[in-house]
């Protein structure tokens, strides 16, 4: 194996890596295979620097380099070469639904933190919670959270039944991550200046949210997949 990878989560610590590699450069999508690479004392393998990210500080993200790395044939994931692309595609609906679910978890925590903060914080001698704007914003965010929860529960039921389709999964990923980012922005605003300080949970939640619209397929790609399902 010769090549490099970037944006690899937990790449600094992983000792077992699922690698998508070209096993037939002339076969297009059918030339991709998934190979399990055991990195301990592996000749030709090295890790790059730990990349500096906007958010998700609790996990490392790194570059990986492979220079003539050799692995046993039985490290191939699956029964034959050339199935890697299709294996990955089969997992995408599950992954995209999961991104929506993690978005909802972050939304719930952000609303809990923000509600607690505005109950305790006073401005001009009045609880921030008692301002109409605050109450309206919280009402809007809570409603969006519950709408998201209902849709995701439907997606989970479809996943359990084996009928989760690409379009529904794309909706879950797009709507969940978009709503997450919108709500984090509103929650930061309700914290005022403290919402810009990294020691407050809401600030870290805000920073962590942004990448949700990028990984797992950008939200623009999600919209394209949803639109394709309508043009049949």
Question: What residue spans do the PLM features occupy?
Answer:
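Alpha-helical interface subdomain recognition
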Residues: 63-68, 79-82, 90-232
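Conserved hydrophobic/aromatic beta-strand scaffold that supports enzyme active sites
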Residues: 16-20, 34-36, 61-68, 224
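Flexible, small-/acidic-enriched active-site or ligand-binding loops
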Residues: 42-70
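A short core secondary-structure module
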Residues: 2-49
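A generic fold-level signal
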Residues: 11, 27-29, 58-59, 164, ...
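Cytochrome P450 core scaffold surrounding the K-helix E-X-X-R motif
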Residues: 44, 75-81
């Amino acid at each position: 194996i010769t090549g490099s990878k970037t944006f690899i989560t937990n790449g600094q610590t992983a000792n077992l890596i699922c690698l998508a590699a070209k096993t037939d450069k002339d076969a297009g999508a059918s030339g991709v295979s998934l190979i399990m690479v055991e990195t301990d004392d592996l000749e030709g393998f090295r890790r790059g620097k730990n990349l500096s990210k906007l958010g998700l500080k609790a996990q490392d993200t790194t570059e990986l380099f492979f220079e003539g790395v050799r692995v046993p044939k039985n490290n191939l994931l699956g029964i034959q070469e050339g199935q890697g692309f299709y294996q990955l595609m089969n997992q995408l609906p599950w992954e995209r639904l999961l991104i929506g679910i993690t978005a909802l978890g972050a939304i719930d925590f952000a609303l809990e933190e923000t509600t607690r903060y505005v109950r305790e914080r006073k401005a001009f001698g009045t609880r921030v919670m008692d301002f109409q704007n605050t109450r309206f914003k919280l009402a809007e965010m809570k409603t969006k959270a519950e709408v998201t929860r209902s849709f995701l529960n439907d997606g989970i039921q479809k996943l359990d039944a084996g009928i989760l389709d690409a379009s529904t999964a794309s909706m879950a990923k797009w709507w969940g991550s978009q709503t997450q980012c919108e709500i984090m922005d509103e929650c930061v605003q309700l914290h005022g200046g403290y919402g810009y300080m990294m020691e407050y949970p809401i600030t870290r939640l805000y920073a962590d949210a942004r990448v949700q619209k990028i990984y797992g397929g950008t939200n623009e790609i999600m919209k394209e997949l949803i639109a394709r399902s309508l043009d049949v």
